[in-house]
Amino acid sequence: MTQPLRRAAGSLLVVGLAGPELTGLERAWLRLVRPGGIILFKRNIAEPTQTRALLTEATGLAAPHALRCVDVEGGTVNRLRDALAPLPSAQAVAAAARTLGRPALGREHGDLIGRAVRAFGFNSTLAPVLDLALPEAAEVMGSRTAGSTPQEVSAYVREFLAGLASQKIAACGKHFPGLGGAAGDTHLLTPSIARSYEQLWSSDIVPYRELHRALPMIMINHAAYPATFSGATPASASPFWITKVLRQRIGYRGLIFSDDLEMGGILKFMSIEEAAVTTIRAGMDLIEICHSPELILRGYEALLAEAERSAAFRKLLLDRARTAAHKRKRLSAQSESRPLTQKQMSALRERILRFNDTIAAASGAQTAKNTTSPVEVS
């Protein structure tokens, strides 16, 4: 197996780590795999200096220009909550923007999240959520969605992306082609969304159609859409959704990112080996394996084994790695940052808390308005 092929296979992986410091075992497999990205979770993040040191060491063992990713959407998905401050959810910010007639609140949300993730040494956040707040997914998605219509979602996301870009942080829109109709959680199973392609194209997919040029990365979900050409196959393994719809029909040119391949939404459908190969073959640029070193290594070895078996896959792997490396380089070059002083961190925390107060006050105003509004009976 040639060294360029090993480097190519590893560079298509975005991997997670066990704790706040690298272990000897992690250093060994990072040197072997040389992944294209590192993603950190709450278990990895204690405070800014420690997090920056962890990212510096891990990316030093990874592929050149490796992504440094974290999930900070606000609300329930905020890996920096304990280390910095809580942030309001997309739902709360979007609702406040509509209530107060201040769409720029979405931009401030993105700006603050951008400042926060930069302060900890990241160059990308896996946000915003572009899913619609439909009744089917209310229990699963909760406050992560900005609105129930494409117009509401696009209005918030457009502002959020501008704020994030002002801090030179790469966004990742998710979860294409839409989880608004998902009654189940893709962490646990493969939800079956019974919406037709026409319904999805004219509703769930509209924010992607409108905003794809502003999204450096888009994440594909693990739900199935049996009423479309993809049948029972999860979207993350479907060339129909990744290549035909997102790449060709919408014309997306950024990085296409899988949701975590350790999720039940795909691992209950296929093995980690099959998932790694199938998602890359379907058109994925980067695949996430976020927790288990064993599964990371199995996914990596599966890509190499398939490349050795198939000349066509070997060419695909090398081409995909070359293209993804170019895009990663462009993103990482935009996001170099210096550590904040303790005084600057305190000022950022205070600014976030003031923003929280603004959103909470708007929520109270909306509640009062709803309480005093006349009730129509139909």
Pin down the residues of each PLM region.
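Divalent metal-coordination and catalytic microenvironments
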Residues: 4, 38, 71, 117, ...
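Catalytic domains of carbohydrate-active enzymes, especially glycoside hydrolases
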Residues: 28-41, 112-114, 119-124
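Divalent metal-dependent hydrolysis catalytic cores, especially in the metallo-beta-lactamase
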Residues: 37-43, 123-129, 283-287
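Preference for extracellular/luminal or secreted protein segments
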Residues: 1-36, 239, 248, 267-378
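Glycine-rich anion/phosphate-binding loops
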Residues: 46-53, 97-115, 147-156, 198-201
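N-terminal small/glycine-rich loop or linker at the start of catalytic domains
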Residues: 1-12, 73-95, 132-142, 172-192, ...
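Glycine-rich, aromatic-flanked loop segments that form ligand/cofactor-binding clefts
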Residues: 59-88, 106-133, 153-177
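Second-shell residues forming the walls of enzyme active-site clefts
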Residues: 16, 22, 43-61, 66, ...
